[in-house]
């Protein structure tokens, strides 16, 4: 049986993401629903893809640093994801697929020869069915919020 909590890393050095060059990150600390890890990569990496687990899930990012400095923000210039971002004090993402990923545009950041991304997050696994229903609910809520904002703007 495959361990769901294994973190898989893909490095794009200009050739895209290749399954055969991906690897499972060693040394991931898991305590309860909290994961902490360091991802080491060289300055030739353009984009780093982090697959946090092999399950639909919710991630709350507690720490996310590059070479000891907080990542600039979680906008699309730096971070792309196949999850849905939920606003809050800490970045939170809902992934309704069993292949969740965060793509870090490290080429847009100041890199050294050797670099380290440090991540700490809390997670909750869920079935893809629950994830899909939650995603549809969030889509519905976001649509309703846009309608309310448009009504308020017109007044």
Which functions belong to the PLM regions below?
Residues 1-28, 73-83:
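Non-cytosolic beta-sandwich-type ligand-binding/adhesion modules
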Residues 16-42, 83-98:
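Extracellular carbohydrate recognition and processing domains
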Residues 50-57:
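Short beta-strand-plus-loop segments that form exposed binding edges in beta-rich domains
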Residues 84, 114-116, 122-130:
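Mature, function-bearing regions of proteins
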Residues 125-155:
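Boundary detector for helix-to-coil junctions that initiate low-complexity/charged tails
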